Amino acid sequence: MSCKSNTLAKNYTNHPLRINEIHLPWKPTIPNTHYEFVRAQVVDLLNELGLCEDKKERDRRDGVIMLASYMYPEAGPQELLFGTMYVLWLFFFDDIFDESKFLKEECNQAAERSLHIFRTGKAPEKNAKLNFSIVQLEDLLLRIFAMANDLAKSSDITARFMKSCEIYFVDGAVPMENFRQMKTLPKLEEYLAVRTIDGGAAACIACFEIVAHLDLSDDIVNEPRVLRMCEIAGQQIAYANDIYSYHREKLHNNSMNSLNIRCQTLSFEDALTEQIAQLNGWVQEFETLKQSLAESALWENSLKMYITGMENIVMGCKVWSESCTRYNLKSLLTVVV
């Protein structure tokens, strides 16, 4: 999952996944200038916690650190450290289910204990039978919440962040795991509703409020147009990721992908055409909503920064996905130079 820090997304042609047809109108993000500092801090922390001890896990760690650097390109050093730790936790927690690292009862235990932390900010009591990996992830999560309290403009912002973690877990990670256990693929609309949340975009946007030291009111964050833009960011990341990860998931015999669901009634090329059109349509809707807000009485610098944060998270995921070795897209395409 490692990425070269100086590699940006390129324009590709004749790619079997047609990624050059996914159009985003925003400026590509570049790695945060504090990347090296944050990487050193994260490596020390994970070593202290006993995480990422084998090469595969270290490669994954380095890849996620770079991803966060693309997602939060203008964050200060401590703010980027906080955002990076949270994105790492999302990947670690997803791997509990996705790669079946724990027994079923251990997965349930990790889930229940994490939910307790989301709701209280405190870890439940430990016992001798607790899997050490669960303890490690809890320690990481508690450090993340401690940083959130230190960096957030107000306790309301911290509470909103913790609530987004709970929603990610309850409405995203757990239902997605239930889908993986099914013998048949879910309906496309059911999959999208869960995948949008499981992709973690809304949680990363809530994290951005802390990273950027914003202090938006609930009325602004919950304004229907703003909510829809946040949802679009999640949909765009989820469906684009399903395209980027398609061949990797085939190699791992993972059929839980929107393209596979579409292919139940469409050819692969038609499924890809439909999905790319939907992605580009969502971006057009996002831009229309942004223009509507810019012309409204709600428009002010903090809201503009909030929306720019959404754009950076989406664009950062695109740039990283097209340049990282996790999906190894370069091996499947002809590069335009």
UniProtKB/Swiss-Prot annotation:
A motif (D(D/E)XX(D/E) motif) lies at residues 94-98. Mg(2+) 3 binds at residues 241, 245, 249. Substrate binds at residue 195. Keywords: Lyase, Magnesium, Metal-binding. Signal peptide: none annotated. Mg(2+) 2 binds at residue 98. Its cofactor is Mg(2+). It holds the Pfam family Terpene_syn_C_2. It catalyses: (2E,6E)-farnesyl diphosphate = alpha-muurolene + diphosphate; (2E,6E)-farnesyl diphosphate = (-)-(E)-beta-caryophyllene + diphosphate. The keyword Hydrolase does not apply. Its EC number is 4.2.3.-, 4.2.3.125, 4.2.3.57. GO terms for biological process: terpene biosynthetic process. Mg(2+) 1 binds at residues 94, 98. A motif (NSE motif) lies at residues 241-249. A motif (WxxxxxRY motif) lies at residues 320-327. GO terms for molecular function: (-)-E-beta-caryophyllene synthase activity; metal ion binding. Belongs to the terpene synthase family. PANTHER family: BETA-PINACENE SYNTHASE-RELATED (PTHR35201:SF4), TERPENE SYNTHASE (PTHR35201). The 2 conserved active-site motifs D(D/E)XX(D/E) and NSE are required for coordinating the divalent metal ions that stabilize the PPi moiety of the substrate. Terpene synthase that catalyzes the cyclization of farnesyl diphosphate (FPP) into alpha-muurolene, (-)-beta-caryophyllene, and one unidentified sesquiterpene. TPS4 shows only trace monoterpene synthase activity with geranyl diphosphate (GPP) as substrate and produces very small amounts of myrcene. P.polycephalum has a unique biology and these volatile terpenoids could function in internal communication of P.polycephalum, to mark the territory that have been explored, or they may be involved in chemotaxis. This is Terpene synthase 4. It comes from Physarum polycephalum (Slime mold).
